[in-house]
């Protein structure tokens, strides 16, 4: 492979890394398939596969949340956690308005409280190991996360006992850690 091809591949990998670090969902979607179609070295392809898995899991989970919101009916209520229910007041592809404690609360997708985001995703995906991995990756990279939530997400990944359909859980953890140590 020429230096030019390798440099272009490196730029694509850098763009993918930056999209993940910024939780830029649109950019992640755009770059994911382009990344795997890009000609690159074996080492670069290995990195591309790792980044693709992170993007795939995160987008899968975020899509579960947005699909769940799209299926909610105005006026319906549901349990977020034990003894905590919300009523759906309004919804759009970008936000959800729920009522609890006699107040309306408006959230964009990225601002949803974790308990609410995870409950919405559960409406769409079963509690299998793939969805646990997706939940972990989403919580790790989402804009409103913090170090404690990242540690919790890594713990969920470590607790996965079965195969992830070709996705190596150790690779997920090491890729996430390397991406976010680069960022800091």
Name what the model sees in each region.
Residues 1-184:
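Compositionally biased alpha-helical segments
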């Amino acid at each position: 492979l020429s230096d030019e091809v390798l440099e272009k591949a490196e730029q694509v990998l850098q763009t993918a890394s930056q999209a993940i670090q910024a939780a830029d969902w649109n950019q992640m979607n755009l770059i994911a398939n382009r990344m795997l179609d890009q000609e690159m070295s074996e080492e670069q392809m290995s990195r591309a596969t790792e980044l693709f898995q992170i993007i795939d899991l995160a987008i899968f989970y975020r899509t579960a949340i947005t699909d769940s919101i799209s299926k909610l009916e105005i006026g319906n209520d549901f349990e977020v956690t034990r003894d905590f229910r919300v009523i759906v007041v309004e919804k759009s592809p970008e936000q959800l308005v729920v009522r609890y404690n006699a107040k309306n609360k408006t959230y964009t997708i990225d601002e949803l409280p974790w308990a609410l985001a995870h409950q919405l995703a559960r409406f769409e995906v079963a509690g299998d190991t793939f969805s646990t991995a997706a939940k972990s990756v989403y919580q790790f990279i989402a804009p409103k996360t913090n170090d404690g939530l990242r540690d919790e997400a890594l713990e969920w990944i470590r607790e996965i006992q079965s195969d992830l359909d070709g996705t190596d859980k150790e690779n997920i953890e090491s890729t996430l850690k390397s991406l976010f140590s680069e960022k800091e």
